[in-house]
């Protein structure tokens, strides 16, 4: 199974049974709630889907080095999300959030499925790695989600102790 799909399955397994209150509870004023992390992941999927639909056809096919995408999982390397990827701060139920994430992921998966084989070697800009092939971009989404899965586990521990 690809890291892209594996990470999402792990996310849903980790969050099973959490109440809406716990999903929306912030460990502190400066930290995101689990729901906010999920909203950020939704925005990543939306941005990736838009990029694949609008920019892949014009992107160059070229060989670039494999990037160490797993470093995206390292939470010691803190990064602030760009403003367009920051979460909304409203209360949303877990079932609504899951529906929204599932719909966006289905749209992203459909965009990926519509690509031709050579499109996976096209190169697109990336804010951290400068440029990635479409194949690397898709893997990056999985590694990025695993980073936030660790964050959600930390948040869960903090709010269960509170």
Swiss-Prot record:
A family per Pfam: DinB_2
Gene3D superfamilies listed in its UniProt record: dinb family like domain
SUPFAM superfamilies given in the database record: DinB/YfiT-like putative metalloenzymes
Region ranges (Disordered): 65-93
InterPro entries: DinB-like (IPR024775), DinB/YfiT-like (IPR034660)
Top-rank taxon: Bacteria
Disulfide bonds: none
Segments of skewed composition (Basic and acidic residues): 65-76
Protein name (Swiss-Prot/TrEMBL): Uncharacterized protein YuaE
Source taxonomy: Bacteria, Bacillati, Bacillota, Bacilli, Bacillales
Gene transcribed to yield this protein: yuaE
């Amino acid at each position: 199974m690809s890291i892209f799909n594996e990470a999402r399955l792990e996310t849903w397994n980790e969050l099973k049974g959490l109440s809406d209150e716990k999903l929306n509870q912030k460990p502190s004023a400066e930290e995101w709630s689990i729901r906010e992390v999920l909203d950020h992941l939704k925005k990543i999927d939306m941005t990736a889907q838009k990029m694949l639909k609008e920019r892949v056809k014009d992107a160059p096919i070229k060989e670039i080095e494999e990037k160490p995408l797993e470093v995206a999982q390292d939470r010691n390397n803190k990064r602030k999300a760009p403003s367009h990827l920051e979460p909304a701060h409203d209360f949303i139920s877990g079932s609504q959030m899951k529906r929204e994430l599932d719909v966006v992921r289905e749209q992203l998966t459909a965009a990926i499925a519509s690509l031709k084989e050579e499109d996976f070697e096209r190169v697109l800009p990336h804010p951290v790695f400068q440029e990635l092939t479409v194949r690397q971009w898709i893997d990056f989404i999985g590694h990025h989600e695993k980073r936030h899965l660790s964050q959600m586990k930390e948040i869960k521990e903090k709010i269960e102790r509170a």
